[in-house]
From Swiss-Prot:
The gene is CTSD. It comes from the Eukaryota. Residues 328-351 have a biased composition (Low complexity). CDD domains: pepsin_like. One of its GO terms (molecular function) is aspartic-type endopeptidase activity. It is found in: Cell membrane. This is Probable aspartic-type endopeptidase CTSD. The lineage of its organism: Eukaryota, Fungi, Dikarya, Ascomycota, Pezizomycotina.
Amino acid sequence: SLIDTGASRTWVFGSDCTSKSCGAHNTFGKEDSKTIKVTDEKWDVAYGTGKVAGVIVNDTMSFAGFELDTPFGSATTASDDFMSYPMDGILGIGPQDSKAKVPTVIQLLMQQKLLKSNIIGINLQRNSDGATDGQITFGDVDKSKFSGELAYSNVVSGGYQWEIAVDDIIVDGKPLNFQGRSGIVDTGTSFLLLPPDDADLIHSKIPKSAKSSVFYTVPCSTTTNIELSISGVKYAIKPKDYVGYESTTKGICNSLIIGRQAIGPKQWLLGDVFLKNVYSVYDFDKNRVGLAARKYGETKDPPSSSHPPPAPTSNKASGGSPGLPEQSGTSSATTSTTGEPSSGSTASPSAASSVSMSAWLSLAVFLSTASSLILWD
């Protein structure tokens, strides 16, 4: 499953799915489990690219040495967008919307007091670094994956997205003086999505960049340094992450910074283009996001391809949780450099874990990042 911080829903492709895209994936149903219980409750969700629908089922989810009885979605239809996505479902780890009726996996873990702390730590890898898997740690942070201390930013008003205030973007050492911007931290989005005027300004500072519709091209050899400032801390966005596939013109690549207003006029989607440069922590107790510079091995050249990424679309959820807020949230983001997560349950874990990182239960599983995805609901 794809780990998605931009959504709280968890679902898999069901064995009863009739859509062509389901044939490209592993499915799950009654023939795979004797304990699955299918309900009459319908669900559907439209992401930035793609839509799925189906029914809610209940079954036991097993991972990291213990079992969790949980409801989740079983997709009976899925749009063709999912044909090429290398995943068989989505594990939603975004904050739960207060209006949602179905508890999330994270809520159940918290209710049963299975975690050392009610936090999640995520480390994404790059293909160009020779590894396609990242790591997610439930209940703790992996200090071997980042340098320095974690800096925490409070989630802005609204609360059901990991949305934090953004100070500014700096290009080759020069601030662009953005004001009142916020960013949704979203592992389910491949790109960095900004309203057109914001994306125009950034690319105007990259030599020999050009625009076509919502897309931009830049020289494949560009060395322009981009930094994102959050809570007073600057985080690099390296060229190997924002310089994407080679276009039809030799030496010219597509930029993965996209000029598309996916949400509000001052809201950005901070996808994998940004997240591959940081270690990110999601604190459910204190409603905040922690960031630190990620440790990684350097490589010289980004991967190239003759195919540009598909155009993103902006669709809101239908019949499920409400879509993202239209108005940009504003709040003062606070920074903590203690490097310590918030304290969670003090109850002993109910099951041992083969990947325990301490005397308490800390769950670690591996994740892959799919290309050209925009997943928020």
